[in-house]
């Protein structure tokens, strides 16, 4: 599943590519991709003649802020003059990704949603496993109230709220493994399997440790490691091990730089001990027994 760095990479690509993109036509190729509104035609009508004003990210969710354009508008010089038109929210789930096509072709087998502007440029959403979802939340409603997972998210790893005081309270008396804590989106938003493994390795902490046993100096190292690993991956365009692509169809390159993830049986870069793999809460976990305590 695309994690914070992959979703941030997509967000940046969308923001750079979709300048003055006014949605003129919406084509739903798979109705189950539209999670809200229930009536799919409300989704279509809500997006039509909407200017995609800004792309935000919250955890693994993409959020496009929309402005209402006149049906005759083809270019907007002053976006501030337009009324807000709610938000388009996207969760890529396991295999979702976008492509931007100036010369659209017929939709491929796994095309789920197609958005066209006045020049027939196409923003295409493709999803092999079809777990990804989209919501159009009209102005006046809060996406956090409509989308349960979005409203339950913990703080962003880069935010001021994600500090040592917060982490200390979170792990207090917790017998869960520290890795399961990091994977809990209600505790910290956006970290998944890849970056939990990599961050714990960088901090020298065993993923199997009970959270309550992590001392303050270790928490400090872990917080720094999380931020550094995420920033490094964003700089590399994220990680691709299966279906993730950026808007240009390129793979992320962070997978070439991992220390433990998907390196089972290979030598640790630091101590030459072999990287091991074992499941925690049903998730494959990669670690170095010697470097992580």
UniProtKB/Swiss-Prot annotation:
Q: Which cofactor does it need?
A: Zn(2+)
- Which GO molecular function entries does the Swiss-Prot or TrEMBL record give? 8-oxo-7,8-dihydroguanine DNA N-glycosylase activity; class I DNA-(apurinic or apyrimidinic site) endonuclease activity; damaged DNA binding; zinc ion binding
Q: Which family does it belong to?
A: Belongs to the FPG family.
**Chain ranges of zinc fingers (FPG-type):** 259-293
Sequence positions that bind DNA:
110, 129, 174
Q: Which Pfam families does UniProt cross-reference here?
A: Fapy_DNA_glyco, H2TH, zf-FPG_IleRS
SUPFAM superfamilies, per database record? Glucocorticoid receptor-like (DNA-binding domain), N-terminal domain of MutM-like DNA repair proteins, S13-like H2TH domain
- For this entry, the protein name equals Formamidopyrimidine-DNA glycosylase
Gene assigned in the entry? mutM
Q: Where is the active site?
A: 2 (schiff-base intermediate with dna), 3 (proton donor), 60 (proton donor), 283 (proton donor)
């Amino acid at each position: 599943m695309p994690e914070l760095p992959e979703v941030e990479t997509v967000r940046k690509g969308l923001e750079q590519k979709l300048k003055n993109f006014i949605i003129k036509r919406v084509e739903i190729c798979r109705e189950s991709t539209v999670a809200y509104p229930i009536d799919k035609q409300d989704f279509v009508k809500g997006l039509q003649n909407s200017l995609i004003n800004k792309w935000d990210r919250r955890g693994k969710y993409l959020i496009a802020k929309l402005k209402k354009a006149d049906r005759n508008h083809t270019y907007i010089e002053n976006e501030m003059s337009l009324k807000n038109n709610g938000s388009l929210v996207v969760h890529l789930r396991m295999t979702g990704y976008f492509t931007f096509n100036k010369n659209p072709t017929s939709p491929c087998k796994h095309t789920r949603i197609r958005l066209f502007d006045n020049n027939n440029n196409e923003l295409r959403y493709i999803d092999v496993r079809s777990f990804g979802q989209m919501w159009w939340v009209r102005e006046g409603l809060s996406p956090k109230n409509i989308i349960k997972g979005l409203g339950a998210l913990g703080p962003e790893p880069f935010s001021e709220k994600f500090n040592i005081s917060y982490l200390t309270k979170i792990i207090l008396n917790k017998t869960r493994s520290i890795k399961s804590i990091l994977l809990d989106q209600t505790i910290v938003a956006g970290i998944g399997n890849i970056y939990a493994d990599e961050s714990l390795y960088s901090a020298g902490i065993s993923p199997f440790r009970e959270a309550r046993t992590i001392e303050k100096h270790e928490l400090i190292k872990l917080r720094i490691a999380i931020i550094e690993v995420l920033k490094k991956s964003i700089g590399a365009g994220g990680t691709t091990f299966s279906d993730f692509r950026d808007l240009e169809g390129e793979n992320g390159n962070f997978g070439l730089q991992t220390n433990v993830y998907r390196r089972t049986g290979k030598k640790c870069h630091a101590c030459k001990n072999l990287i091991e793999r074992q499941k925690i809460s049903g998730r494959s976990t990669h670690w170095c027994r010697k470097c992580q305590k």
